[in-house]
Amino acid sequence: MKIWFKLWTDTRLTASETIEITDDDTRTHKVFRALEEACLAFDLGKPIWLDANVNEFKRRSKARFTKDNFVEEIEFDYMEMQVLEED
């Protein structure tokens, strides 16, 4: 599974990271692990999954995390994650 993480500020892409998870774990575990790796790469705390994020991810394999999803203050408008390749 390959997931693309992007940080957006004022409609501009300010940072990007692609994480690839190749083990035989479940899809959910792969998504959570990729999110954790991306947050480490961006030096961020992990966002909180709200119901809207879960529903959007189920429908479109894509989710946006805004300031409402983070405990600490963030310096960007939102982080977007998108599944590029499934196993």
Task: Label the predicted regions.
Residues 3-5:
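Amphipathic beta-strand/beta-sheet edge segments enriched in Tyr/Trp
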Residues 9-11:
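Solvent-exposed strand-loop boundary residues in beta-sheet-rich modules
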Residues 13-41:
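Short, flexible N-terminal segments of the mature chain
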Residues 34-87:
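Acidic, low-complexity intrinsically disordered segments
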